[in-house]
């Protein structure tokens, strides 16, 4: 990176602490061990523009990372140009990524004052949190920040109807866009969603000052209002983090003297000196998932004890028991071999055991350091966020993010610097992007079908993704694409490095294949023993559970949305399993049922015969050997298990055949419906295709076992052929976002940007325009909506709906007055023209399942991201939300307005 030679007076070093608490002296700087994070001098707007335009002073694009490879440092490529706006990479002949900042345009007709808002405008990006390793944008941007009633970027008067029904009082500046702006392989062309994302009428807008504060929680946007005015979701009315007054004293504390600080001061010092925000936020989220300090420690100890037990019991049972004397012995001492570890274990096994003991020692040492790190995170939660460990199992993640946002604002206010106040900001979108920086790329990787996991073998041409193969893929690809700090290497953005990176990736695949060959015997043994101990008792006591199903690894990646955190996805996935079982059970398999009935009859007959004979001589007949070393008791257990398995697999109950309706309800949870499924929901082919995603657990265990053997061959022969596509994928799917660094372009929700080519009046009219022949409901059109736009909708809804502010294991509670309405209606039925919803107790699939599980309200257990929350679709005279629905809050309110308007015309 080239520094500006014209700048004689070098400004102070740009550290995270200086951004948060103001510029400090060199004496303090050296004492607090502040890390240098940028070699770029901070210029004003004129100097910055001159600096960028000067061809002799081009500088590399900076992100949160530094290159960790020697090949990047010695690269002869021309540096990538950086603009202070959002960066998009496009391939050009010379291999240099050219940047295209978003342009701003006025309304065509000028009927509404200001400009059409842009979801992530240049002003929004300029006011984002300053990323580590990057200089701030021009100071003029912060000086032009509006105040008072005009607070917020110009033109942010109209909000998206999706986010109108708010939880925390936040509104999105998201405006309408037409199909011209929603183009590309991942952008939908749904008419319904064109209307949903159309511009809202001017009469539905609110105070812009309030909107700026609200939107700052979800997306990076400056706020001039007091952050203390932000409301937190009930029942956790957390107090905003306090403004700390002793920060100047803490800045003079040396890193080696942290032991002299109190826990609160230590937590504040750690927060002020964060060097890698991605790692820090990941630790905060892991602490939230683990439910606190002691729960995480106990979980780590239990995992370590599980490994020890599996190795100990397998070694002991294999070398310390004399099985030849079992039949003639009556006590354990008679079959136990004394000093078996010295006399029975071979030297090779002893070496392996000592290696295992060394591994356990390293895990214990790692646990010691984990305890120290967890203690710091605990202090951060308790003293800075005001959240105790007792609240973590039930507190919503949205509340934690809100406290993080407020804490960042309080630190900026403490610095008393205009630039820091305006630009050092966090948001829910930033937090999710940083935590899921790698996961978002993995989601896009599988969604684009980049990887070829087949083998040139007739029986394995469609090899499925397994956990062991997934672990190897992450190790080879993500471990190569991201440096040790967790950021994408800039070499992946240069087309000239494509061939070199592809060859290096092939070498990693081949090396990983050899390592899997070496470790496969141990992995197979451990896998068999672990699952045997885990599932044997379950299958023995309840043999019918052998027919239980679970989602495959590839299904989990395809179902997961961009920026959807793990606990949100897990809740949605588990809630969908009940509906998935109901859907599959509606397709009777007559042929299999006939065969299983015969096997059940035969096995039951043998059990009956042996049981009757046992009555005559119970003492001796149970030990009677029917075959060599196989007694009556053995065969009774065997045939009894076979009978139970067949009985559980045969569905003898009468079920209502409504696969199409059930699958639509299932799709509302999985958010997955290929276009090939349209119009075929009731067919056996779609059911079989879904069963590949929701397979039998016993089948998945067998596939995992076989995968340990086949993984080396996939790494040798299949994945190296995709190396070029993988490198191209990272270059084409990576964007640079100021304040975040290099991220997956689909995770930035660029498809939600407004179309400035249409004025507000035209977009508002398109939202309410619908032909009488448009019989498809919004639920039906969800099928054709692209994943990125769908991820945006559910992300906004997850963080804005009050009913979604729940703990990790909590469901939506029943609402007063919501009983007695059918919940199995499609959107078309619910909003049918000229019809009213009947007050009756419907018995659709959802309601029947909830009644079976003891739930009076069918909405309980329906996560559905509440974007299509069914409880909000019904006009309830007994609830207090009637007025808000009439005002048109949210997507449902807009649809209600449209149909009400249509009925009035009639």
UniProtKB/Swiss-Prot annotation:
Low complexity biased stretches: 126-137
Changes after translation: Phosphorylated by ATG1. ATG1 phosphorylation is required for ATG18 interaction and preautophagosome elongation.
Primary location: membrane
Keywords: Autophagy, Cytoplasmic vesicle, Endoplasmic reticulum, Golgi apparatus, Lipid transport, Membrane, Transmembrane, Transmembrane helix, Transport
Gene Ontology cellular-component terms listed: autophagosome; cytoplasmic vesicle membrane; endoplasmic reticulum membrane; Golgi membrane; phagophore assembly site membrane
UniProt note: phenotype after gene disruption: Still forms preautophagosomal structures (PAS) in proximity to the vacuolar membrane.
Family membership noted in the UniProt record: Belongs to the ATG9 family.
Additional comment: Kluyveromyces marxianus proteins are shorter in length and have a more ordered secondary structure than their S.cerevisiae counterparts, which might contribute to the superior thermotolerance and solubility. K.marxianus could be therefore useful as a new model organism for further elucidation of the molecular details of autophagy.
Protein's name in the database: Autophagy-related protein 9
Source species of the chain: Kluyveromyces marxianus (strain DMKU3-1042 / BCC 29191 / NBRC 104275)
């Amino acid at each position: 990176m080239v520094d500006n030679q014209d700048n004689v007076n070098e400004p102070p070093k740009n550290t995270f602490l200086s951004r948060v608490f103001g510029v400090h002296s060199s004496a303090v700087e050296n004492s607090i061990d502040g890390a240098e994070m940028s070699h770029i001098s901070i210029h004003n707007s004129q100097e910055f523009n001159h600096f960028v335009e000067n061809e002799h002073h081009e500088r590399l694009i900076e992100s949160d990372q530094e290159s960790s490879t020697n090949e990047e440092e010695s690269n002869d490529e021309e540096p990538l140009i950086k603009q202070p706006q959002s960066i998009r990479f496009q391939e050009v002949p010379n291999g240099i990524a050219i940047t295209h900042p978003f342009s701003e345009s006025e309304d065509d007709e000028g009927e509404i004052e200001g400009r059409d808002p842009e979801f992530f405008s240049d002003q929004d990006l300029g006011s984002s949190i300053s990323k580590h390793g990057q200089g701030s944008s021009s100071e003029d941007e912060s000086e032009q920040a509006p105040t008072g009633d005009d607070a917020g970027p110009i033109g942010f008067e109209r909000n998206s109807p999706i986010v109108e029904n708010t939880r925390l009082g936040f509104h999105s500046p998201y405006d309408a866009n037409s199909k011209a702006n929603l183009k590309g392989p991942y952008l939908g062309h749904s008419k319904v969603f064109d209307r949903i994302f159309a511009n809202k009428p001017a009469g539905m807008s609110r105070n812009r000052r309030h909107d700026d504060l609200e939107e700052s929680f979800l997306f990076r946007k400056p706020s001039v209002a007091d952050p203390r005015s932000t409301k937190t979701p009930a029942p956790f009315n957390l107090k905003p983090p306090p403004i700390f007054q002793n920060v100047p004293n803490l800045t003079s504390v040396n890193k080696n003297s942290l032991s002299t600080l109190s826990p609160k001061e230590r937590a504040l010092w750690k927060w002020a000196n964060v060097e890698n925000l991605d790692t820090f936020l990941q630790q905060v989220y892991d602490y939230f998932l683990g439910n606190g300090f002691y729960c995480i420690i106990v979980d780590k100890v239990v995992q370590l004890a599980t490994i020890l037990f599996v190795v100990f019991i397998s070694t002991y049972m294999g070398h310390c028991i004399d099985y030849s004397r079992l039949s003639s012995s009556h006590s354990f001492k008679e079959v136990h071999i004394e000093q078996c570890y010295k006399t029975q274990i071979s030297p090779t096994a002893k070496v392996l055991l000592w290696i295992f003991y060394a591994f356990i020692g390293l895990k214990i040492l790692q646990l010691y350091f984990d305890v120290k790190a967890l203690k710091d995170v605990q202090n951060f939660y308790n003293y800075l966020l005001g959240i105790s460990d007792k609240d973590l199992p039930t507190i919503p993640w949205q509340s934690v993010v809100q406290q993080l946002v407020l804490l960042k604002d309080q630190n900026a206010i403490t610095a008393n610097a205009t630039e820091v106040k305006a630009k050092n900001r966090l948001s829910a979108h930033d937090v999710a992007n940083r935590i899921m920086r790698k996961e978002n790329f993995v989601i896009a990787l599988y969604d684009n079908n980049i990887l070829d996991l087949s083998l040139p073998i007739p029986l394995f041409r469609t090899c499925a993704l397994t956990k062991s193969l997934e672990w190897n893929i992450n190790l080879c690809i993500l471990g190569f694409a991201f440096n040790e700090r967790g950021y994408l290497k800039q070499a992946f953005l240069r087309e000239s490095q494509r061939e070199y990176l592809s060859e290096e990736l092939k070498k990693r695949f081949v090396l990983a294949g050899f390592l899997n060959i070496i470790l496969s015997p141990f992995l197979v043994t451990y896998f068999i023993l672990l699952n045997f101990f885990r599932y044997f008792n379950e299958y023995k006591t309840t043999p019918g559970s052998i027919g239980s199903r679970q989602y495959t690894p590839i299904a989990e990646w395809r179902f997961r949305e961009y920026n959807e955190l793990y606990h949100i996805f897990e809740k949605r996935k588990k809630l969908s399993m009940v509906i998935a079982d109901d859907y599959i059970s509606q397709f009777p398999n007559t042929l299999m049922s006939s065969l299983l009935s015969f096997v059940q009859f035969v096995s039951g007959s043998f059990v009956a015969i042996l049981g009757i004979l046992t009555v005559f001589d119970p003492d001796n007949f149970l030990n009677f050997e029917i075959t060599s070393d196989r007694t009556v008791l053995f065969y009774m257990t065997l045939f009894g298990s076979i009978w139970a398995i067949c009985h559980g697999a045969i569905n003898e109950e009468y079920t209502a055949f409504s696969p199409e309706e059930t699958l639509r309800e299932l799709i509302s949870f999985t958010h997955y419906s290929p276009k090939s499924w349209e119009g075929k929901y009731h067919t056996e082919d779609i059911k079989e295709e879904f069963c590949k995603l929701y397979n039998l657990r016993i089948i998945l265990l067998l596939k995992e076992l076989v995968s340990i053997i086949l993984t080396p061959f996939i790494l040798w022969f299949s994945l190296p052929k995709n190396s070029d596509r993988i490198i191209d994928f990272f270059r084409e799917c990576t964007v640079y976002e100021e304040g975040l660094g290099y991220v997956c372009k689909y995770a930035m929700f660029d498809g939600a940007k407004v179309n400035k080519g249409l004025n507000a009046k035209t977009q508002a009219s398109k939202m309410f325009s619908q032909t009488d022949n448009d019989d498809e409901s919004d639920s039906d059109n969800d099928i054709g909506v692209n994943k990125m736009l769908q991820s945006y909708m559910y992300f906004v809804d997850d963080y804005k709906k009050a009913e979604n502010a729940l703990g990790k294991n909590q469901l939506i509670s029943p609402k007063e007055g919501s009983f007695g309405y059918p919940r199995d209606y499609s959107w078309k039925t619910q909003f049918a023209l000229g019809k009213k919803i009947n007050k009756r107790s419907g018995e659709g699939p959802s309601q029947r399942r909830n009644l079976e599980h003891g739930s009076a309200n069918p909405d309980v257990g329906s996560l559905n991201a509440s974007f299509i929350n069914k409880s909000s679709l019904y006009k309830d005279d007994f609830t207090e939300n009637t007025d808000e629905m009439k005002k048109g809050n949210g997507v449902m309110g807009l649809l209600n307005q449209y149909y009400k308007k249509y009925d009035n015309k009639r």
